[in-house]
Design a protein with these regions (language model features):
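ABC-family P-loop ATPase nucleotide-binding domain
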Residues: 1-38, 324-341
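ABC transporter nucleotide-binding domains
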Residues: 27-34, 39-233, 239
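Short, structured secondary-structure boundary patches
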Residues: 64-65, 78, 158-163, 173, ...
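An acidic, carboxylate-rich microenvironment
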Residues: 85, 101, 123, 138, ...
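Short, basic, helix/turn surface patches
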Residues: 124, 164, 303-311, 328-341
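ABC transporter nucleotide-binding domain
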Residues: 198-284
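Short, charged/small-residue-rich alpha-helical element at the C-terminal edge
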Residues: 251-325
């Protein structure tokens, strides 16, 4: 223990030390963390050494092609599937040891909504409210949040696909969760339905402070609503961070003639140019180095048609991550069932 040095009370100008205050509680930095989480079904590794870090608040986009391991991961976050190895922490606590306390604080919509088609939207929600011991007033509240108040008395079988998805989200919201997990919530919707669900997700996160994890295989959807993304392919987390971070620093491209002479002069400056047709490719350089390189080439009689910094588009970076093959390990296990990813 450390003690602050104080002046003796008899000293001139002595001021009693202020009482120490307890540290101010800091908000939980991550709503969800996984540490080395792996899931195997028999010899098949579906999720491999996954380290997610989902910040509290905002929208976390979980991107990956079909079968990449998105649904399996979300099931493990809900305790519906048990990790083969690794740890899942939700709200800073181990899920396995604190499941009964954690799960009531989570809402989810995994692999589509389930409801009684012959009952109305409101009746379906009352059943969920009864099961979760929620106040009946929450039914009207969530209907309003998802924009189904006018359709509350309509049978669920008469709902459009987009309305059914919103009903499923309403069911997930009825307990007032702090964390919402949505698995491909816009799958199969027309553009209007996609926009409705997207706007609802952003509203839940930014206006109501709910942490939302939403999975999708479409970059264009996640790009319009997520603050942070995790990209998974073949069970491996290939990238995690802001979407802007997917763009690399780019390449400095010079269109020159003659190319061979330009390469020789740039190498003399200590640079490492690569030629591609009538272009020279360099890593990004400081402005003063670019100016020096251009002056050297012009002085040597090399014609320069263009100098530009090229960056990958988000789509190019995403496709590069998700189309590169990943070798998955196999386990010597011979028992167990195969599961969906």
């Amino acid at each position: 223990m450390m003690f602050a040095q104080t002046t003796h009370p008899s000293a001139v100008g002595y001021t009693p030390p202020a009482p120490q205050m307890p540290p101010i509680a800091q908000p939980q930095q991550f709503a969800v963390e996984t540490r080395g989480v792996t899931k195997r079904y028999g010899r098949q590794t579906v999720v491999n050494q996954l380290n997610l870090a989902i910040p509290s608040g905002g929208v976390y986009g979980f991107l990956g092609p079909n079968g990449a391991g998105k649904s399996t991961t979300m099931k493990m976050l809900l305790g519906l599937a048990k990790p083969t190895t690794g740890e899942v922490r939700v709200f800073g606590r181990d899920l396995r040891a604190n499941r009964a306390d954690i799960l009531p604080r989570i809402g989810s919509l995994i692999e589509g909504p389930a409801f009684y088609p012959h009952l109305t939207g409101a009746q379906n929600l009352r059943i969920v409210a009864d099961y979760l011991s929620c106040d009946k007033s929450s039914v009207d509240a969530v209907l309003d949040i998802v924009g189904l108040t006018d359709a509350a008395g309509k049978r669920a079988r008469q709902y459009s696909l987009g309305m059914k998805q919103r009903l499923g989200i309403a069911m997930a919201l009825i307990s007032g969760p702090e964390l919402l997990l949505l698995d491909e919530p816009t799958n199969g919707l027309d553009p209007a339905g996609v926009a409705e669900i997207r706007n609802l997700i952003v509203q839940l996160a930014h206006d109501r402070g709910i942490t939302v994890m939403v999975s999708s295989h479409l970059l264009s959807e996640i790009e319009q609503m997520a603050d942070i993304v995790g990209i998974i392919q073949s069970g491996h987390l290939r990238y995690q961070g802001p979407l802007s971070g997917l763009r690399d620093q780019g390449q400095l491209v010079m269109k020159v003639s003659p190319v061979n002479a330009a390469v020789a002069h740039l190498e003399a400056l200590g640079l490492r140019p690569q030629s591609a047709g009538d272009e020279i490719i360099l890593p990004p350089l400081r402005d003063d180095l670019i100016a020096e390189a251009v002056a050297r080439l012009v002085g040597a009689g090399v014609r320069i048609a263009r100098v530009e910094l090229r960056r990958k588009s988000l789509e190019e970076a995403f496709l590069e991550l998700t189309e590169t093959p990943v070798v998955m390990p196999t386990s010597p296990q011979t028992t167990g069932r195969r599961g969906r990813a």
